[in-house]
């Protein structure tokens, strides 16, 4: 994966940012740049360093440390966000790719061949009126529906746990117990604090001005600048916290662990939590208590890495328009609660004791809240249970694994077990969610899949090759 991710990146260096050129790609379609630094971010960088996180500007691209602070990259350049759409539009547009919008894939078409072998030959999909169509695959079908929809499509296709399929009267093609299992998601918690000094946050532009949104949108539309064109977060950090738990929490200290790993299963080279802060008030879950003119607030955010809780995704019916049912089973493993609580505890120490922030933070927000006074790991448990939520980083539900892994759905080439001509290409294939954000790994998975497909098809002449997933709209059924 390390050689695949940079292929997606078109890094845009900035004079102020000391980047590591070996950690970035320059020719990819995604325009990537470091986020600009707000005044409040300088305060947090000082506090992070005061609390033991060395400053490593490009650490989130280089992967050089699990204990440091630096700058996050963003897929925004000159005020515009770049996305996967840039692979198939603009300079990357290709004549052999047909994009169909406002359609919903129901299932993969599977046909039996010699010796009862199975092959994916296309998909069935519906338009918004419910009319059903077929698309034929010349070579392969690639599912890229994401962690929730890829397993749903497999289940409706008859690929998944036999008992789940039979409950819905879906003919079973392949009994794959792991489809929809192993759901993981980084839990994220926003904890709010009051800032007592004007000019550090962006609240004047965001909360205080009743016309802020209209003016911000107008500025962005006309100039691609302003607060809607930038990144609402500041300094970022990674930290190892297991030693703190060993010191202060007997339950953690007595937990089983493999040699060289903490109870989360992580080594010293892997962070336990990520930390960052907003540059104004805002964030889940309530979107209330916005500061009035003369008031300023922000959130300190803690993001759990290496979570041990596992959930699942399934379908309740064969209706492709019915959303899948997902239960992430957050905090079902006690280790997650202890570690996330420790992350929030340490973050609170950064905010209230760190050299750069202690004099500009008045206490908790909204006024009257007292969470800034919490001291022990246990003190934070109820806060974490109440406020921890999703970071929208799901993965794992079409797990990649060895043949002897009963929950493996795809092999190392991303091919679905038991069916030829079918791959899954998205974050659902991750056996373990990485200790970081999923955006660039998702592109890396796609780049790696492209390599596999080209290797598989290299014997075909370029003149006859029509694309590994050359879907063509078929007749209405």
Model-derived features: positions:
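Conserved redox-cofactor binding core of oxidoreductases
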Residues: 1-111, 119-120, 191-194, 202, ...
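Short coil/turn segments at secondary-structure boundaries
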Residues: 10-16, 58-63, 84, 198, ...
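Surface-exposed beta-strand-to-loop junctions
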Residues: 21-29, 64-70, 164-166, 319-325, ...
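A structural signal for well-ordered alpha-helical scaffolds and beta->alpha junctions
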Residues: 37, 41-42, 80-84, 158, ...
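C-terminal structured subdomain/cap of oxidoreductase catalytic cores
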Residues: 96-193, 197-198, 298-356, 381-477
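Structured beta-strand/loop patches that form or line metal/cofactor-binding pockets in enzymes
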Residues: 285-305
